[in-house]
């Protein structure tokens, strides 16, 4: 099931990356992020997916951020034996430091619980990866 969620996330990332380039700050990436976020919210992955995880309330609770739906994409899957999370935030000059600070806090919380987590940036995007596949996802995103 972890592989299914990971494969879905990669598929969504690949679909979005065909539209533009994060490193070049291509304006089409805004459209790609919006599309990816919408698909993540609409996707049904069964019992593995926590249905309340992709809404603004979870974002506020986990990251202490209030963002418009077009400014983030978030997948969070939790079971008693598995915790996976991938969040991508679109940043601008006004909110860059705030989002990065909140993302660092989220990574630190996961590390305190012994869960692998990584924080990274790519162009005007900040990403947070938490869980077993975090290292693999980090390597993938750094290659974009």
Predicted regions and their residues:
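Positively charged n-region of N-terminal signal peptides that target proteins for export
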Residues: 1-4, 8
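C-terminal motif of bacterial Sec signal peptides marking the signal peptidase cleavage site
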Residues: 13-16
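Post-signal peptide N-terminal segment of mature Sec-exported envelope proteins
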Residues: 25-45
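Short, compositionally biased low-complexity segments enriched in polar/charged residues
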Residues: 46-84, 95-99, 116
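Second-shell loop/turn segments in exported
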Residues: 84-93, 125-130
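Short amphipathic alpha-helices in soluble, non-transmembrane regions
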Residues: 98-106, 138-144
